[in-house]
């Protein structure tokens, strides 16, 4: 009798744990990217996935991680040892951009899914290699942007897709602030962010990737990229540009995007122009602008799309690809645009897309 009841429960799924109760494990590789400190406290709570390890070798960063995450989370100096001992389902990597490929080379054969902070890679060659590895081993690779979890981004896109401004012909974006901090734990971030090899560029990479992502999300791959870079504060940023402008061209559209470490306050603003109006977006609000401006309602995102770990876990659980702004393909395209922009800065000429692979 008991055997038949157990069989019935199994057949109807009543004896299994609900999907939400299935535990996923996440590990952190590297603490050199300052964004880690805004995510680590939530990871330590284990709401969506259990934090099973952190890998870092810099003593000051290790001490800060221990303070934030607690003594119960093991900290490793060898990230590959951590992967083999803890066997995480997901790795969130906060290393230099030029090490992203290395991390995927370690994680992909172990069937570990990966989250990176933007951009996907420091070079187009590495971005292509990351995609090839992800496809070969069947893992998810997600590229995290702060703005990917803003209701404003989705409200603006929904308004444009509904035809509220007519055919889109122009994008104008500005992203930036007064420059990266260089004190406390931030000094380690500053050191590699201002290194053209480790970052891939300066402000052009740091903020150009946001603008390139917007461009692709709204209009797809441009036909050409022209870029200019400015070195306004060589005493602070001796190796890289601290301000840049991208000019993207499509058959019947254009985009003008600014990214800078020299602004008096923080900006992450986009305006999408159509033939009958525009949509203006910041993190806090979205406006439909015609002769007069009207505020567009912003709906809360569903829980599985409200933060990076929840989104990754939902994709793994549902065996569905990461989509939208954090998807792998669109972020390969982002790095391609930045690569073209760097070539344009070097030559002073527009660069046609697609780039040779």
Model-derived segments and their meaning:
Residues 6-16:
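Bacterial N-terminal signal peptides
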Residues 20-69:
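N-terminal Rossmann-like dinucleotide-binding module
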Residues 28, 77, 116, 141-143, ...:
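Hydrophobic residues in well-ordered beta-strands that form the structural core
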Residues 34, 147-237, 348:
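Predominantly a Rossmann-like dinucleotide-binding segment in NAD(P)-dependent oxidoreductases
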Residues 58-61, 71-133:
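Beta-loop-alpha module in the N-terminal Rossmann-like domain of NAD(P)-dependent dehydrogenases
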Residues 90-92, 314-357:
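C-terminal helix-rich "cap/oligomerization" subdomain common to oxidoreductases
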Residues 129-147, 167-169:
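Rossmann-fold dehydrogenase core element
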Residues 212-285, 309-321, 340, 357:
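Contiguous beta-strand/loop segments that form the cofactor/metal-binding neighborhood of enzyme cores
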